[in-house]
């Protein structure tokens, strides 16, 4: 077992693990030797970190704006390694927000935000400047949403990770063409790396850094 980031371990070659504050599973996941198994086949962030552990400088004490939090599964793993940090988890679905609120009752470093990531100005009173912007949304204008949120909330030199979903943008064009176009549309950032995600068809992760 190898620690690749503070609190994040490679458990065998194809699994990650975190050190949770509680030994009780949150979503039916396995607990092995006190570590919480994180399956990259089920989480795009886990798939990215297994190939490119890009969160150095963010964990363990950074602030994160997470767009597209859904019911909070990946948010909870990120919370495990942000032991001294904070996650602002933005989700538009009231049903998913109920799950996020239950999660936040167990994790003090998660703040659920019911809101539309395409309207970042609506949560200005809640979200502070952040060290990482993480986006996993299904809207068509994914690059625009990421760029607008980064311009408001991401600190200079802050890290941005965008999971681009090709089929949410265009169901007919080739995925590679969609990825190229969305990356070109990102503004105010320098793209550091584009990472293919095994087990996540028609998705790619884009890692970028905000310009000063």
Curated annotation (Swiss-Prot):
What is the protein named? Fibrillarin-like rRNA/tRNA 2'-O-methyltransferase
Asked if the Swiss-Prot or TrEMBL record annotates the protein with the keyword Membrane, the reply is no
**Residues reported in the UniProt entry to bind S-adenosyl-L-methionine:** 73-74, 91-92, 116-117, 136-139
Cite the EC number.
2.1.1.-
Instruction: Name any one GO molecular function.
Output: RNA binding
Task: Please give the biological process terms from Gene Ontology that the record holds.
Answer: box C/D sno(s)RNA 3'-end processing; tRNA processing
**Entry superkingdom:** Archaea
Q: Name one Pfam family in it.
A: Fibrillarin
The record's top EC class is transferase
Its lineage reads: Archaea, Methanobacteriati, Methanobacteriota, Stenosarchaea group, Methanomicrobia
- Spell out the family assignment given in the record's similarity comment: Belongs to the methyltransferase superfamily. Fibrillarin family.
Q: What is its quaternary makeup?
A: Interacts with nop5. Component of box C/D small ribonucleoprotein (sRNP) particles that contain rpl7ae, FlpA and nop5, plus a guide RNA.
Summary of the function given for this chain in its UniProt record = Involved in pre-rRNA and tRNA processing. Utilizes the methyl donor S-adenosyl-L-methionine to catalyze the site-specific 2'-hydroxyl methylation of ribose moieties in rRNA and tRNA. Site specificity is provided by a guide RNA that base pairs with the substrate. Methylation occurs at a characteristic distance from the sequence involved in base pairing with the guide RNA.
Q: Which gene encodes it?
A: flpA
Keywords for this entry? Methyltransferase, RNA-binding, rRNA processing, Transferase, tRNA processing
The disulfide bonds in this chain are none
